[in-house]
């Protein structure tokens, strides 16, 4: 899909279709009023006749509107003007793209980016329009022998901005929107891949392919032999029973002018399949445990977006690839593991494995002397119970970092909700035999998991993003969502100091 921005009057646009908004009840937007005036009341007459009420998502396609150069005009219902918010705006964009594809339009000029969305500027509206467009067009059919065909698919979208001085910010929004969309696309592709294909080695291969494309990206891998030398016994224990080798992939992006600038480190849990191990999961929906590498998919997707945007910062992405399987040599409930940090962990449940992988990685990244570390993981079902499918769980003992992350979530629409990380919860991890257990019990499960991780992050500022509820959808629309690529990408944009306001 090709995107561009321009500033101009709707009646002068030569395009297969121009898209304008209509408010409820039957009220023309400013741009629609211009078209109505040029067409001598053609549009308002249709509305008076009851052809379109203006309710959110209603569509009316007009052909050969008098005195308008475009072949078609698509009227889009936007609801009540004062109630047009972020969620409704994105839904309207998605419905518009679907309608344009159904009509066979190959190009369109969209004036919906000129609508007033509460608290949002041109940059946000253009960028969200691009991301919503690309998300709506995504499909995963790589393994289907019969692929569906879209009739004359939409190939070019032009977003109109109110004034010429906003063209630069619109172009920046396109740059960021297309980059984040590319990252989300990669995240979804990798996460949707079945576990017989997507194993830790596959994750590593995807990272290496990126390094061949982007010259400032370097990729190295650490296998089980090297992990053993490093003392990553906890990580190794989780993958011991799998026929697929555990592989930690390290992606180093050098974008800062000063190569010695401290890096931001992103760590992604990469359980390419989680059977639960000896503490075997129920069979129902176990197929979805291929998404237990959603954190790693989010990190590789964010690294893709970062490389596309060429941000002037140093970032290291870690894909903690592993597979948790049952076998005669699997680790067991009751085992006590000595982590890379030297701390010991009593295993109470082998299905609480993500934290056992992450704790060693969080110790490993100390060698980079990081500016900060953010780990992202499909860590706990408890987070899904607490927050559902809309907000990721954010944990951090560093208030400034937590506020930055929350702000990035609000900006990107990939929102997070801060959860407590109080010392009182730490007691729930007490063990009579080791320094801690890997399970704090049923109450506050997402919090005690974060408390566990916090014990391995004392040497840097750290945040933990639990995306168990947001990384994928179940049911009829089963598949990866592409999250948390938007929030992580926005965080990096902000950290890079890129100007995005008008």
UniProtKB/Swiss-Prot annotation:
Cross-referenced Gene3D superfamilies, in alphabetical order?
Leucine Aminopeptidase, subunit E, domain 1, Zn peptidases
Compartment annotation: Cytoplasm
Question: Single GO cellular component annotation?
Answer: cytoplasm
The residues that hold Mn(2+) 2 are 269, 274, 292, 353
Entry keyword Hydrolase: yes
Cited Pfam families: Peptidase_M17 (PF00883), Peptidase_M17_N (PF02789)
Q: How is the cofactor bound, in the record's words?
A: Binds 2 manganese ions per subunit.
Reactions performed catalytically: Release of an N-terminal amino acid, Xaa-|-Yaa-, in which Xaa is preferably Leu, but may be other amino acids including Pro although not Arg or Lys, and Yaa may be Pro. Amino acid amides and methyl esters are also readily hydrolyzed, but rates on arylamides are exceedingly low; Release of an N-terminal amino acid, preferentially leucine, but not glutamic or aspartic acids
Per UniProt, the keywords (alphabetical) are: Aminopeptidase, Cytoplasm, Hydrolase, Manganese, Metal-binding, Protease
List residues binding Mn(2+) 1: 274, 351, 353
In its keyword annotation, does this UniProt entry include Nucleus? no
**Any one Gene Ontology BP term:** proteolysis
Query: Which GO molecular function terms does the record list?
Result: manganese ion binding; metalloaminopeptidase activity
EC annotation from Swiss-Prot or TrEMBL: 3.4.11.1, 3.4.11.10
Names of the cofactor(s): Mn(2+)
Q: Which InterPro entries match?
A: Leucine_aapep/pepB, Macro_dom-like, Peptidase_M17_C, Peptidase_M17_leu_NH2_pept, Peptidase_M17_N
To which protein family does this belong? Answer: Belongs to the peptidase M17 family.
Which HAMAP family does the entry link to? Cytosol_peptidase_M17
PANTHER family referenced in this protein's UniProt entry, alphabetically: CYTOSOL AMINOPEPTIDASE (PTHR11963:SF23), LEUCINE AMINOPEPTIDASE-RELATED (PTHR11963)
Give a short account of what the protein does. Presumably involved in the processing and regular turnover of intracellular proteins. Catalyzes the removal of unsubstituted N-terminal amino acids from various peptides.
Stated name of the protein? Probable cytosol aminopeptidase
Organism of origin is Shewanella frigidimarina (strain NCIMB 400)
